[in-house]
């Protein structure tokens, strides 16, 4: 386990926090766009040598404390029999979404066999980075994945799944359970392949009421995190005021989106480490302002139990020099 990450998870005082960035590998880098001229997104994530090259591009540029595998939260749809593709301007589109309660009965295939390329990618990454760099695996959360397969694509409200919860609660829970079971296998697979940290992205769980999150999602999060023996991070958007629910999930670290005041979060969560939470839009400012805002965030978070990150993924059009300024701000904070 990478030392700086381990110390942050343990709550030890640090001269600076470990730093990485959600969507760290990807579209804002010109070298990434060159690769994508030859490979589609799905081809790139399912070809380990290409996915490893993409993952390592920001590692070579910015020297982050963690590299997050280049993959997608929807990869686990395949073993459950869902097909999807990407549409320009739309994003992921599920080709056979849930249309009835019967569609929530999902026997699944062999995760390690069907997603063999994920394990090989992690093995390549652990061999490529130095011992002080954490290799981060990840997975989508059961609510977010269920939302995608019910709606068929991204949505502001994911009303199809929320309606299923109201009209056919047994089918709703059956779908959540199907994803929970496969996610347990998937994160165990990533851990066995050599991942140092696992982040669970249940990004849209904040659409639920606190009572529904507590009843339907929290027990399933706990099951997933109980299956993992390495450090874990949970992330969901729009959870300000309900951070205690994320802290109860069993994850070691609570990820914060940019709408949360980090000082308030530290007070509410006590000794629970946090991750985040610079607004990704701030990376469109001048590099000097990016540095200033990043270092202000580091100061507000305190000298222990903090992993520096954005409050969500870096935007595709973010200037590369501003991404560099974000990482430089962290590295220079220790000087």
Where are these regions (language model features)?
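A gly/proline- and charged-residue-enriched helix-loop-helix capping module
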Residues: 89-128
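Short, solvent-exposed coil/turn linker segments
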Residues: 40-41, 98-100, 261, 279
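Active-site loop segments of alpha/beta catalytic cores
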Residues: 117, 121-335
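The substrate-binding groove and active-site-proximal loops of carbohydrate-active enzymes
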Residues: 42-46, 105-115, 173, 280-284
């Amino acid at each position: 386990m990478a030392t700086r990450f381990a110390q942050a998870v343990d709550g030890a005082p640090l001269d600076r926090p470990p730093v990485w960035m959600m969507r760290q590998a990807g579209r804002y880098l010109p070298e990434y766009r060159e690769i994508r001229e030859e490979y589609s997104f799905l081809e790139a994530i399912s070809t380990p040598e290409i996915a490893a090259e993409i993952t390592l591009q920001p590692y070579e540029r910015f020297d982050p404390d963690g590299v997050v595998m280049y993959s997608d939260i929807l990869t686990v749809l395949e073993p459950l029999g869902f097909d999807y593709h990407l549409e320009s301007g739309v994003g992921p589109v599920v080709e056979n979404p849930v249309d009835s309660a019967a569609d929530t009965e999902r026997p699944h295939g062999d995760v390690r066999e069907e997603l063999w390329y994920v394990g090989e990618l992690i093995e390549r990454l652990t061999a490529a980075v130095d011992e002080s760099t954490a290799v981060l695996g990840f997975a989508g959360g059961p609510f977010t994945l269920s939302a995608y397969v019910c709606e068929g694509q991204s949505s502001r409200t994911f009303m199809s799944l929320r309606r299923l919860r109201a009209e056919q609660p047994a089918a709703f829970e059956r779908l959540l359970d199907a994803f929970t079971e496969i996610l347990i296998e998937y994160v165990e697979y990533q851990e066995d392949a050599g991942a140092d940290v696992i982040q669970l992205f249940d990004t849209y769980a904040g659409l639920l009421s606190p009572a529904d999150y507590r009843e339907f999602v929290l027990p399933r999060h706990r099951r997933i995190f109980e299956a993992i023996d390495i450090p874990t991070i949970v992330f969901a958007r729009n959870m300000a005021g309900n951070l205690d629910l994320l802290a109860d999930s069993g994850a070691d670290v609570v990820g914060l989106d940019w709408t949360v005041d980090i000082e308030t979060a530290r007070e509410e969560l006590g000794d629970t480490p946090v991750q985040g939470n610079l607004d990704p839009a701030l990376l469109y400012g001048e590099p000097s302002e990016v540095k200033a805002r990043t270092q202000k965030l580091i100061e507000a978070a305190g000298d222990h139990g903090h992993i520096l990150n954005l409050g969500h993924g870096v935007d595709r059009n973010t200037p590369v020099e501003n991404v560099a300024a974000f990482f430089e701000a962290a590295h220079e904070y220790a000087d």
